[in-house]
Design a protein with these regions (language model features):
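N-terminal accessory beta-strand-rich subdomains and adjacent acidic, glycine-rich linkers
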Residues: 1-165
């Protein structure tokens, strides 16, 4: 038997990699807050505000990355109870916009994080053990399929990104 506690549907390493500035000085992250009576309330945050910044000094700490993460997720059986299962990141310097969505009516997780090499990553998944108490035991010969996800990277901002995803 093999126990599963986390299986990603999509990973993108290197959001806002291009250009001259580090990602934490030029990346805006749009978070899609949602509720039954107040749907699709997108809020824009810069990466530093979400604590996805790099250390500014070299030495004991690691200059250029902080190993922090910022997550939001669906909870329970209502997949959009606090957030929509999607997100947008925009590189203000290069004009690249990254858009993605989880295509699931169940639990899901979206995670941004800083990693070695001065990169910002994104992972998209279904339910996880850490956030949702999810566990799947696979017996020999059994298969597991992750939740579907869609993603696009475009030049030109939010409108072209939304058009590419739809």
């Amino acid at each position: 038997d093999q126990g599963l506690t986390y299986v990603s549907s999509f990973i993108y390493q290197g959001i806002s990699r291009g250009g001259n500035k580090p990602y934490y000085k030029k990346t805006d992250i749009y978070v899609p807050f949602n509720s039954w009576c107040c749907e699709a309330q997108w809020q824009k945050y810069d990466a530093e505000t979400l604590n996805l910044n790099g250390m500014v000094v070299d030495g004991f700490n690691h200059q250029g990355y902080g190993l922090n993460r910022y997550c939001y997720s669906g909870k329970g059986t209502w997949s959009t109870c606090e957030y929509l299962p999607m997100g947008i990141a925009e590189d203000r310097e290069t004009g690249e916009t990254y858009i993605f969505q989880v295509e699931s009516s169940g639990q899901w997780l979206i995670e941004y994080g800083s990693a070695q090499g001065g990169n910002l990553y994104l992972t998209v998944s279904g339910a996880t053990e850490q956030e949702h108490g999810w566990y799947k035991n696979l017996k020999p010969g059994e298969c597991f399929t992750t939740v579907p996800a869609g993603a696009a990277v475009v030049k030109g901002g939010l409108n072209p990104a939304v058009a590419a995803l739809t």
